[in-house]
Amino acid sequence: MNGRYVGYVAGHDPLHDFLTRIIRDHMGVREPQPAYRVFRLSGSNEVYAYEEKFSAAKIICKFYGSRFGWDRDKAAWMARQEYEGLETLRRYNLIGSPHHVIRPLGISRDINGVLAVEFYSGEGFSHAIARATRHRDDAHLYWRLKALAYFLATQHNRTANGAGVDFEPDCRYFDTVVGRLEQADRIGQWDIDELSWLRDCWRDRPRMWQDRQVWLHGDATPANFLFGHGMDVAAIDLERMKRGDRMFDVGRVAGELQHAFMSAVGDWHRAEPFIGHFLWEYSCHFPDRQRTFESITARAPYYMALNLLRIARNDYIGRDYGGRLVARAKKLLRAA
């Protein structure tokens, strides 16, 4: 079990009964005196893994409570939203091999707004990227990107609803990110004016409005995908799931790849073969691969830039590197 071991769940803790109901009702485990080991998982949210000592049954719990100042109703609403998002995607037969959306197992308003989901054993996307950036294991990352492209193309194609995309919300999100960069004193007024002008240039391009809406993962970062055997991929953490342009997901993956190589080896060019491979593999799941590839590569720079700006706003990003991210984002936005 990954994560830092922090002890056992006390028998009188309401969480103990919550976990026991889940392993009994969803896993068929009827241990008379269950005991749960607790592991704190890394990440920005309060996420813990629980392993029942005798049966080895595993559950992941995500707690929303502390994020909202202990507003139980808000926390419960967020937990319910993610629960329903997981159920929604699973109804499109994204279950099992090779495409899997993790199964939600339960929620509780009164236990810190907890959402319980199944445990999926697999390699994290971030680990696959690190094998390439740190150990030059490029073949492994190429294989994982092929699998991820297959997963996302399947999710997007199965969930397309025929309605046209609305690019305006992605422009508003761009403004939100730029505003946070300004608040963090990462950019000045000249940068804001230039970024706003570039945003308007993209808004005026018909291609940004011409695709069909799909269900998006909404936070397609390396932390939120796990790889199993062969082409198996599992998606986790769907709290930001929404309808929109498929490029919001695809471009975020591409932007994360560029960031990974910029931060690890100092060279955005090293990411280009992987980004191209990912976009090409995504395109192969459409009737006209070449036309699809041309369409998504024409839109990708906006969403890649948006992701680099999103990363640059974070406190853990050094000021010099944040400046490089902003500069790279501008170059992407200037693309034809």
Report the location of each language-model feature.
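Short beta-strand micro-motifs within the conserved protein kinase catalytic domain, predominantly
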Residues: 98-113
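Regulatory N- and C-terminal appendages and interdomain linkers associated
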Residues: 1-39, 54-56, 313-336
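Conserved short submotifs of the Hanks-type protein kinase catalytic core
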Residues: 111-124
